[in-house]
Amino acid sequence: MKDQSGKDSIINIADSIDLRKPIKLKVWSTEALAGTSPDQTREYTISVRVHKHDPDSLRWNYVANISNSESIKEQKTVILGENILTYSVVDNVLKVYIAQKGNAMSWVSNSLEENPFKNSLPSSILSYNNKLYATTADNNDGNVYESTNGIKWETSGLFENEHVNLLLAPLSNKITYIKTINETKVFASTNEITSNAKTDQELQVVPDDFPIGNISYTTYTTATGLEGIMLIGEHAKQPIAGDIEAIVPWGYMGSIWVSFPPNNEETSCPVLQTPTIMYYNNQFYIFGEKFESFYTSEAGLAWKKANKKFSFPYQDWSEADFKPSKEQPEFRGRETYSSVLDDKNDYIYILFSGGTASFEEEVEDEEDEEKSSKATKTHTYTYESEVWRGRLNQLWFDKDPLNAGK
């Protein structure tokens, strides 16, 4: 190692070393030290990279507005190949807004061709084998419709002679769904259609406490290589855990659907409006409107609030006249949204419909001179039809170790 004059010096490991810049170390063999083989040396360069971002935190970035001219309302979003597609009813017309995952700053509005959905959102929509599959809101005919681009739709032959009520979730080799047989709703999958693996009498009957709509699902692979589905949604009667209404996930490991009711109120996920479930960094997460926090679980049974580092953007409102911006974003209080997970790049996309957000926050009571009591303050702000994406910093570091964290 060079000293201040540029000459070689011997390192004393008890000394402190400045590692803010790369340093060169020269290692001498015993022969080189003895002078018998002076060329038997080797040089090493040590460079220590210090991340400027906490690896356990979510990093959020504003991407774009879905539309600057159209008012986006209730929406459903899905990924097809390298594209993100968001469906929304605008001025009583169903439209799809499309952007590339690699260029989500640019969104193109499209009217649907051969539109079977009329002026309503699909009741269920998913991506499987480079196609989209969806059911209509009224679904009187029990048909499923398919599309290769999200714009032009036609009746799907994959579900021929089936009366499908609702699509649930895809795995690598099949789509799971609910169908009606002799006025009874049962669980089924597309590989059972093609292989006749089960007779109608062998299919699992859909229980009364299974979600009836607004399905959110996530897929995952276990340590042993088994594919699974975890699913949540709207219930005819919301489940109860102790004294609170709770979200009860349903799981599927290739054969039957099983509920995951919480053991008690303390380990339950409280009911949320329009909840979303995702499997991210080997954990299950649930969040919903108002965007107060994530709830997390290792196996889908016991839930708790996620670490504060794994959170949505929030700001300090103590300054007078503070208003959120794209540079200082605030998610609390927001409502109508949709979300998709880009598994390839580990991005969590959240797409908002524009609106006015309002939330309450506990602050110090200004009238309390001793500052020992709390008061509740309401904050209100407006936001646009925005696209945001977040990623855990550690996953960012892993994908780009040379540049991440800078």
Give each language-model segment a name.
Residues 75-90, 124-138, 166-186, 219-240, ...:
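Short beta-strand elements that form the blades of beta-propeller/WD-repeat-like
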Residues 102-196:
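A generic tandem-repeat structural signature
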Residues 327-406:
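Blade-level signature of beta-propeller repeat domains, shared across WD40, Kelch, NHL, RCC1
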Residues 95-102, 142-152, 184-195, 242-254, ...:
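Beta-propeller blade signature
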Residues 1-73, 374, 396, 400-406:
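Beta-rich interaction/scaffold domains
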Residues 65-81, 114-130, 155-175, 202-226, ...:
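Repeated scaffold domains used in trafficking and secretory/extracellular systems
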Residues 59-65, 76-115:
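Beta-propeller domains
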Residues 53-61, 103-109, 151-155, 193-201, ...:
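Beta-strand initiation motifs
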